[in-house]
A protein has these predicted regions:
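A C-terminal functional module that forms or caps the active site or interfaces directly
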Residues: 46-111
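Anionic-ligand binding region
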Residues: 13-40
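Solvent-exposed alpha-helices and their adjacent loops that cap or buttress functional pockets
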Residues: 38-43, 101
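Short coil/turn connectors at secondary-structure junctions
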Residues: 8-9, 43-46
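Short acidic, glycine/serine/threonine-rich loops at helix termini
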Residues: 11-16, 60-61, 121
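N-terminal loops that bind phosphate or other acidic moieties
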Residues: 24, 55, 126
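Terminal amphipathic helices with adjacent charged low-complexity linkers/tails
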Residues: 64, 123-128
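Short, ordered loop/turn segments at secondary-structure junctions
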Residues: 4-9, 52-54, 114
């Protein structure tokens, strides 16, 4: 597990979990080089890159933890399971946080797309 700019595994809505990652890389160039070397060595499998949510969209840990716990409890009470669980939880957490979790989720997606694109550009330079 690679942490992009972090030595901690970032949870979904916040930046810190207290759990370490195996490696910390700080630039798209470093990510591309790691993938390139792995490919050159013929190693199978992927690389899991964890990318923290931007600081401006990171939620207060106590607030989001409380919302998640309440949403999980409600899902149990409402008999939600299987593939219906994720959409139920996301909607419930959004309601419980007044929409803040949705804003955070959207920014997390944008941030991941930016990093993926930047790393892909750097990888293309290495594989010419």
């Amino acid at each position: 597990v690679i942490g992009y700019g972090t030595s901690e595994l970032p949870p979904f809505y916040t930046r810190k979990s207290g759990f370490g990652v195996d490696y910390e890389l700080d630039t798209p160039e470093q990510l591309a080089k790691a993938f390139h070397v792995k490919r050159e060595l013929g190693l199978r499998g992927g690389l899991l890159v964890t990318n923290p949510i931007p600081e401006a969209y990171s939620m207060d840990k106590e607030v989001i933890d409380k919302a998640i716990a309440e949403a999980v409890e409600d899902a149990k009470k409402d008999g939600i399971h299987g593939k219906a669980t994720t959409p139920y939880l996301l909607a419930k957490i959004k309601d419980l946080t007044g929409g803040d979790s949705l804003d955070s989720n959207i920014q997390l997606v944008f941030n991941n797309a930016r990093l993926g694109a930047a790393a892909a550009v750097e990888l293309s330079k290495l594989e010419k």
